Structure formats: structure tokens, C-alpha cells
Amino acid sequence: MKSVGLITEYNPFHNGHQYHINQSKKLTNADVTIAIMSGNFVMRGEPAIYNKFTRAKMALSTADLVIELPATASLSSGDHFAELAVKVADYMSVDTIAFGSENNDIKTLKQLAHSINEIEQSESFSQKVKEGKSYPRIISELLEHHEALASPNNILGISYLKAIAKHAKNINAISIKRENAQHHDSLIQHHQFASGTSIRTSIISQDDHWHHVVPKDIQHLYVTPHITLNQIFPYLKYQIIAMTTESLKNIYTVNEGFENRLKSTINEATDFHHFVKSLKTKRYTYTHIQRLLMNVLLNIKPTDVTRNIRAVKVLAMNDRGRQYLKHLKTAFPERQYITNINKSNAHYFTNEIKATHIYNAISGQQQTDFNTPVIQQYR
């Protein structure tokens, strides 16, 4: 069976995602579409608006198979996110990865990926790091502010291409042009497509605009948000106050004395956004800081970070997805394709299980990795 993989977060699923899946399948003539999706915490450095089980059910309206991306991938840099996602795709024997981009010029993106790999080894790069500049700014400066680097999906696409070249040369890549909505649009401005940001804003504010930009047959799944950043902040504040400076120093992505900055600013912080602003420096982007804070919340240490794929968790599948999974289990009997977590296989998913428990403790949701069987229908 020919397969196409999509690296996703679906926070939440919307018409743009449905378009992406359908176009990917059309352009590759794939028999099966595999969504590799972030779990309960996403790359923005925040909890997903709906838990991973609800979002997997949404995705099953169009995709055939939904696989959970390791939790630490979403709480890392774009490059590490891409590396782990590509490794999952390789584990799933994906033929082609299809990603969305603003310019839809795969040749240019591949050239930029090659150039960035070379730049990262240069003295100029090392010098700019010492100057305290952020990674995105350094790359932009050394590539003379190439226009493709101004778009977030282009940048992530470049990370996928770098990871494919390094870890999975057997996987092809194609780009699907994003339609209409811009990544960071805060309001719904189009009758069919909208950004995830604007849809979350619409859902949280309880207006009806989001109804126009998500598939009609799954709108029953878009209930009151499971969790918001405002709910998380008291738990995060408690964690930072309770932890010693030395303990904070041992959290993944906390370095260069940032633990002292956390300690010195937390008592005056009144909410999550105020706290993030008080932590901002020229070296770190807001998104990096938010991911760092989620690592603190989840108590993720460098030794907890997933580097290689030993098993994958299947969140959802339809009949076609089940057929493909059966094929994989026959072709690769040594690999672990887990549909239900139990005591014998839980050690593969320690971070994901912990992230779900903490998400539930704050949100009041009841679905866990142990009591939720693989999702097989979305209606």
C-alpha cells in the first residue's frame, strides 16, 4: 500500500487540514494517509485546546491512521520536532511526507535546507550565537533575509527536509500550498479557511464564526475548550516556586542561567502572558520560552527526551488504516505498533502518559492512555 504522511498538530482540525490531506492523497496517489500528530501539548508551548483523543477523532474524518508524536518533540526546537516526526514517519514506512508551505517551491526549500546545514557548521554561526542572538534571527541574517524564511510553515518545511536528508533518505517530500489564511491570523477572515489561532479564539470567545471553517460532519466534537493557558498558570507558578534553582536548572531547555530568571520573576507574575513577557530576552523567542515553561510544568529533564523511536502509539484508525497497520506488523514483526497501552508496554510512553495525567489534572478530563481504546470512528 502506498502511503503519505502528514506531520500535524490539529489544534483543532479545520478545513485547511482537510484540504491538505485530500491534496496530499491526490498528488501522491496514496492508498493510505497517516497523520503524525502532537499529543496534549503542542509546539506553540501550550496545551492543546482539545485533548489528543478528541483531536484524533476529528482527524479520522479525513485521515486513515493517526499516530501520536512523542511528547518531547512538541516541546523542543523546530529541528528536533522535525527529526522525531520524520523518524516516526520512517518507522511507519511512509513513502512521502507532504507538508504545507506558503511558497510551495520545494526546490528552493531543499536548497535552503542544504545551505542551513552548512551555515550551522560555520564560524559566523558560532559567533552570532555568542552574541546572544536567537536561532531564527541568525539564520535569517546569514541567508540575507531570504523571503522564504519569513513564513513559519516554510521554516518548518525546511526542518523536515533537513531531517529527511539526515535520517530517512528513502522518504520523498512534497509541498502543498497553504490556502488563504495566514498562520498567525487572530480573527477568522475567510468563509472557508482560517488559521488555528483564529479558530481557537472563536471557540474560546464562544462566537459562531468557527462553524464556517471546520468540517460540518465533526462539528459536534467542538465543545467547550478542554483547557486554556489561564487554567495552567497557577499550576506552573506553584511548580516554579516549589522547585529549587538547582532543580529548575536540570529541566530540559533551561540553560544559561535561565533558572534564575524564572525564580526572580515568578512571584510578581499575574498570568501566563505577563510572565512570558517578563522572561523575554533577545536570545529566546516567545515560543521557545513557552515550550520551556511546559517542560517545567511536566518536569521534563534532558534524560527524558525521546531521541529514537522504539514504539509508536496508534490513536485512531479506520478500516484502511487497520489494513495498513496489519501490513506493517507482518513486514516488520520486531517493531512495536501499540493500539492499547497496558503495564507491559507503558514504559515506551512514559512522557506521553505523564503529560496526559497532568493535562487531565488541570482540565478535569477523564480519558487516559489506559482507559481509552484506539478510536475507530468519528461520528
From Swiss-Prot:
It comes from the Bacteria. It is an enzyme of class 6 (ligase). GO terms for cellular component: cytoplasm. Pfam families: HIGH_NTase1 (PF05636). Its main location: cytoplasm. ATP binds at residues 7-20, 100, 153, 178. Keywords: ATP-binding, Cytoplasm, Ligase, Nucleotide-binding, RNA-binding, tRNA processing, tRNA-binding. GO terms for biological process: tRNA modification. It catalyses: cytidine(34) in elongator tRNA(Met) + acetate + ATP = N(4)-acetylcytidine(34) in elongator tRNA(Met) + AMP + diphosphate. Its EC number is 6.3.4.-. SUPFAM superfamilies: Nucleotidylyl transferase. GO terms for molecular function: ATP binding; ligase activity, forming carbon-nitrogen bonds; tRNA binding. Gene3D superfamilies: HUPs. Signal peptide: none annotated. It is found in: Cytoplasm. The keyword Oxidoreductase does not apply. PANTHER family: TRNA(MET) CYTIDINE ACETATE LIGASE. Belongs to the TmcAL family. Catalyzes the formation of N(4)-acetylcytidine (ac(4)C) at the wobble position of elongator tRNA(Met), using acetate and ATP as substrates. First activates an acetate ion to form acetyladenylate (Ac-AMP) and then transfers the acetyl group to tRNA to form ac(4)C34. This is tRNA(Met) cytidine acetate ligase. It comes from Staphylococcus aureus (strain bovine RF122 / ET3-1). The gene is tmcAL.
